[in-house]
A protein has these predicted regions:
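Short, small-residue-biased leader/transition segments that mark boundaries at the very start
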Residues: 2-9
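Short Gly/Thr/Asp-enriched flexible loops that form oxyanion-binding sites at enzyme active sites
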Residues: 12-25, 110-111
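Conserved phosphate/ATP/ADP-binding segment of small-molecule kinases
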Residues: 45-120
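Short, charged, surface-exposed loops that flank catalytic or proteolytic processing sites
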Residues: 76-83, 149-159
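Charged C-terminal helix
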Residues: 155-205
């Protein structure tokens, strides 16, 4: 998630990384939060370098959106082939597993997992017509981390988290003005009902 202000962000990242190493923390999921949906930079370039080289190698997974992946891979992403090249570039460069989120596509919401060993997995998704999408990336990464902590494997954790996020969007919570938050209670139905379709959520390349 987003860490601190521009003045202290590099020190904050270094401190977080040091503590993670000290405690030998596991199941670390890093949502880079480098570039806003609008395309605006959220942190300075020197902080990006610190994030990449200090936190990414410690993580079980990083979850960049398309804009962030373009910065990390130093290339434009316009197609599924571009997603593959970008995800593989990031995974190879920083030695981490990469879930490149496809939610910014105009046609679908397919996500791509590129593993350190070169394996690729697609997670198909459908776009949900809901203007209230504030916090989608944070919700996905947090749900993945929670599933990893519960003992699920990486692919299963992503599939479960993606199913949960889709249902949270479909709950159509509408609060206040602008891009509002998701309904993490799934319309009051409870999370026990959000596993439908998960066994079919993972596809090999």
């Amino acid at each position: 998630g987003l860490v601190g202000s521009e003045m202290c962000i590099r020190d904050s990242i270094e401190t977080i990384a040091e503590r993670l190493r000290f405690y030998k923390a596991e199941n670390i999921v890093v949502d880079p939060v480098m570039v806003a949906t609008s395309g605006s930079d959220l942190i300075a370039s020197d902080a990006v370098r610190t994030l990449c080289w200090e936190l990414f190698p410690l993580s079980a997974l990083i979850t960049p959106n398309r804009h962030e992946a373009e910065v990390l891979a130093e290339m434009a992403i316009h197609s599924r082939d571009d997603m593959v090249r970008a995800a593989q570039t990031i995974a190879g460069r920083y030695g981490c597993n990469v879930l490149l989120k496809g939610g910014h596509s105009d046609t679908d919401a397919d996500d791509l997992l590129a593993l350190r060993d070169g394996q690729l997995l697609w997670f198909p998704g459908q776009r949900v017509d809901n203007p209230n999408t504030h916090g989608t990336g944070c919700t996905l990464s947090s749900a993945i981390a929670a599933n990893l902590a519960k003992g699920f494997g990486l692919a299963d954790s992503i599939a479960r988290a993606k199913a949960y996020l889709t249902d949270a969007l479909n709950a159509q919570l509408d609060l206040g003005q602008g891009s509002g938050p998701l309904d993490h209670t799934l319309g009051g139905t409870g999370v026990e009902n959000w596993m439908h379709g998960v066994p079919d959520a993972v596809q090999d390349k």
